[in-house]
């Protein structure tokens, strides 16, 4: 009886340990599925919009961004512009687009604000910075967590280097940014995320060092032209497979 009980306990300990080990992998996989579904739904929804819908939403976002330029240091003085949560919110859940970072292989929804609910599973747009539509006198700032056991998010943002690119997809626009500055600052140091006259920037923010989180990693990108998508060329041929045993002697011959 004691031997049987010991066996059961060992099996239970094994499965508990296995669950703990597999939790980050399974949870990250689950979150990636949710993120992909949100992006697919977003793309499906924007395909149903009319050109005048795009024009109206971009107009509202442009007006918001212009107001930001006229407010001195909104990140410090706490001034807010009415209607923020409704701008670019096409499906009522706060998603304004998504970010794609090829270097670290992430594609994440971008939501209004940086609440815990947003940052635990996606990227948040910091209110008081430009909405992500590009244009002169804009500086969009996006934030995501790093090192969560449940989601990868910006965990590998420190692997970005100058010259790397990332894109923001907002409605029917794809904005491409090339990394031109990487800095580590203290949380209260915000000079590097202000709007600069005539510039079009997007800065990605996460905590650093990994697991300590006393500072902030800032990865800034300057807007560049979005490359044309590569054309897929289909070649139709009547080619047939040759037995490798026939080819080998021919290749080996002097």
Task: Name the predicted role of every residue range.
Residues 4-7, 13-253:
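Solvent-exposed, non-transmembrane regions of membrane-associated and secreted proteins
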């Amino acid at each position: 009886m004691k031997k049987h009980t010991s066996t059961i306990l060992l099996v239970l300990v094994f499965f508990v340990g296995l669950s703990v080990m597999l939790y980050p992998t399974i949870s990250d996989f689950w979150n990636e599925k949710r993120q992909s579904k949100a992006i697919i739904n977003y793309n499906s929804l924007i395909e149903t919009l009319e050109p005048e819908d795009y024009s109206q939403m971009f107009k509202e976002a442009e007006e918001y961004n212009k107001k930001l330029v006229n407010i001195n240091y909104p990140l410090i003085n706490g001034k807010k512009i009415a209607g923020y949560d409704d701008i670019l919110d096409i499906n009522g859940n706060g998603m304004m687009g998504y970010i794609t970072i090829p270097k670290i292989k992430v594609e994440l929804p971008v939501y209004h604000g940086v609440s815990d609910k947003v940052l635990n599973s996606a990227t948040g747009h910091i209110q008081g910075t430009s909405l992500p539509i590009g244009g002169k006198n804009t500086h969009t700032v996006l934030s995501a967590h790093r090192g969560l056991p449940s989601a990868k998010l910006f965990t590998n943002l420190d692997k970005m280097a100058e010259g790397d690119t990332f894109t923001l997809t907002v409605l029917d626009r794809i904005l491409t940014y090339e990394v031109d500055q990487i800095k580590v600052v203290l949380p209260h140091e915000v000079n590097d995320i202000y709007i600069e006259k005539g510039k079009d920037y997007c800065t990605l923010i996460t905590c650093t060092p990994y697991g300590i989180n006393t500072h902030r990693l800032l990865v800034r990108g300057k807007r560049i032209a979005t490359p044309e998508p590569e054309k897929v060329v289909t070649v139709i041929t009547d080619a047939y497979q040759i037995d490798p045993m026939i080819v080998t002697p021919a290749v080996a011959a002097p």
